[in-house]
């Protein structure tokens, strides 16, 4: 039997009670029950019963809703709120509530009051920042030598900024594609085309400079309107740097308006967000949405082939794939991550329910770490999270050119993951048995918030449980817990 878009809907939603989500949708669109009923060609009383969970939402009604309101197929499933559920689970684990809050309770809370849930997550972020700042003051007060003043983490704020927007910035993405088309750009040799665009439209001269500092990729001089780009960059990398500057000079007002939508960003984070949005524009310009999305579907998301076609590297392709969430033309919802050998995650974004730990650490059983043992080769994994959701992961190491034999070298592993339901669309799933639960590797978001008490790889005890202490018994499991294993 072939897979289709309808079969998962019928299987997942045949007895779905989603009154809270339907009410939320109606209120977001500014509709009354009468107006919603008219749009769906249903009776008002029937819509009222759906909103009060007196009737399940049937497949025909779901199809009507997704068509009329351009909703994703997962909007009315529990997966649609899974990101918020995961964030709240992290919150309750981190603060150590007196009475355990079950996953079912969190899911019900999110379904009925999602905005309150988002507010709780935001408050917790500020609480953690304040706590870390207080710890910094305490450390300086007790330290023998003076420590630098505690500072906020603007990059974490900006990560949250993109995370909260599912890593897709619609207005900026559309602007990049529109400028690409209107300027007569074509794939291939974009570094040269962009240099001409900067000269003709903005009067900016682009110079390939071999005198820039070793770590500098570009340097713009507003007074002379000269953009200097490092000579050691590859053509695709040069194009990215020029496109980033193009965003900062040509889309400055739009970028400022997008940053202004988040009043929680600190002053320093706003500057970082502007650079992040300029980088987003650059990726969207080099890989224009419709053309790139079409190529990704045709090539079954083969990252290397996409990189060859568009003249960019592995990491750039992976990041762009994670942004393909345009309404009516969505790609596979991906998770994008970059980590080093020590497990430090320097880049992470997700358009899915996959949960990154904010408490510290990542799972050593995660295939992204295995990539370092097989440099430059794709490694794959079918992984299951503690909440029961399964994901398909691919990962590969990327190494930047160093500054000579004795100079420092950068080495990262880049991972790209998606819900297992989408894995068959990826060329990397070839030869992998996707429907066999025995192939799934149980992983978690990080030891401190992972409730897999039977995991032999655990490095820290679970914050939400109690460590079992028994003088008369020994165990091969580190930090044995009194909690039931997942």
Curated annotation (Swiss-Prot):
PROSITE patterns to which the protein is assigned, alphabetical: HTH_CROC1
Protein family: Belongs to the short-chain fatty acyl-CoA assimilation regulator (ScfR) family.
Keyword Metal-binding: no
GO biological process: cholesterol metabolic process; propionate metabolic process, methylcitrate cycle; regulation of DNA-templated transcription; response to hypoxia
CDD domains the UniProt entry points to: HTH_XRE (cd00093)
Secretion signal span: none
Name by which UniProt lists this protein: HTH-type transcriptional regulator PrpR
Upregulation: By propionate.
Keyword entries, A-Z: Activator, DNA-binding, Repressor, Transcription, Transcription regulation
Organism: Mycobacterium tuberculosis (strain ATCC 25618 / H37Rv)
Annotated pathway: Organic acid metabolism; propanoate degradation; Steroid metabolism; cholesterol metabolism
Function in brief: Plays a key role in regulating expression of enzymes involved in the catabolism of short chain fatty acids (SCFA) via both the glyoxylate (acetyl degradation route) and the methylcitrate cycle (propionate degradation route). Required for intracellular growth in macrophages and for the assimilation of cholesterol-derived propionate. PrpR acts as a transcriptional activator of prpDC and icl genes when propionate is the main carbon source, and as a ramB repressor.
DNA-binding region: 33-52
Domain HTH cro/C1-type per the UniProt entry, residue ranges: 22-76
Gene name as annotated: prpR
SMART domains associated with the record: HTH_XRE
SUPFAM superfamilies in UniProt: lambda repressor-like DNA-binding domains (SSF47413)
Disruption phenotype: Cells lacking this gene are unable to grow using either propionate or cholesterol as a primary carbon source and the transcript levels of both prpD and prpC are dramatically reduced regardless of carbon source. When the mutant grows on medium containing glucose or acetate as a sole carbon source, there is no significant difference in growth compared to the wild-type.
One Pfam family from the record: ScfRs
Domain of life: Bacteria
